[in-house]
Swiss-Prot record:
The gene is petB-A. GO terms for cellular component: chloroplast thylakoid membrane. Heme c binds at C35. This is Cytochrome b6. It comes from Bigelowiella natans. Its cofactor is heme b; heme c. GO terms for molecular function: electron transporter, transferring electrons within cytochrome b6/f complex of photosystem II activity; metal ion binding; oxidoreductase activity. It is a multi-pass membrane protein.
């Protein structure tokens, strides 16, 4: 093992990277509340893993969505467990994200020079809420259908561009297959990609600037 490790270390400087990570200074005022961001990250990774597993059995059509969810819960091996973890971890992710935002705000972590870190965090918070809205509709039951109809109808009150936004969200004049396809694409591809990109930037900035000091 030492030979293999040394081979990679000579080329990639693994030990230098490890030393940099483990030697990073942690301010003495840091407490458990500073772990909320890491817990949110953990929830996101669990969501990615369980969501990926669910895509093997979920069918994003208005005629088969609900029946495929029932099949996952009743017929698929450990399907009930994976979907339950996905569902409850989604709620946990939202809760941890909200608490993390409050912690950062109350401790002044958004101030100079960490404004960009705050902005990326707000964008990820918006993505998290969007995850909830789009995921809620995927079973395409009565609750999901009417939730989509209400949510996509809200922008209609915006002057001039409101109807165009509704058309863009629904993919049609009414809620249907095009809407479900859009929400499925957003939930499984667009939002995870955006979240991952901004999360990378978020952590790189934290790594560069360090944890903010006490008030």
């Amino acid at each position: 093992m030492a030979v293999i490790y040394n081979w990679f270390n000579d080329r990639l400087e693994i030990q230098a990277v490890a030393d940099d990570i483990t030697a990073k200074y942690v301010p003495p005022h840091v407490n458990l509340f500073y772990c909320l961001g890491g817990i949110t990250l953990t929830c996101f990774l669990i969501q990615v893993a369980t969501g990926f597993a669910l895509t093997f059995y979920y069918r994003p059509t208005v005629g088969e969505a609900l029946s495929s969810v029932r099949s996952i819960m009743l017929d698929t091996n450990f399907g009930w467990l994976i979907r339950s973890v996905h569902r409850w971890c989604a709620s946990m992710m939202v809760l941890m994200m909200v608490l993390h935002v409050f912690r950062v705000y109350l401790t002044g972590g958004f101030k100079n020079p960490r404004e960009s870190t705050w902005v990326t965090g707000v964008i990820m918070a918006s993505c998290t809420v969007s995850f909830g809205v789009t995921g809620y509709s995927l079973p395409w039951d009565q609750v999901g259908y009417w939730a989509v109809k209400i949510v996509t109808g809200v922008p209609e009150a915006i002057p001039v561009i409101g109807p165009a936004i509704v058309q863009l969200l629904r993919g049609n004049s009414s809620v249907g297959q095009a809407t479900l396809t859009r929400f499925y694409s957003l939930h499984t591809f667009v939002l995870p990609l955006l979240t991952a990109v901004f999360m990378l930037g978020h952590f790189l900035m934290i790594r560069k600037q360090g944890i903010s000091g006490p008030l």
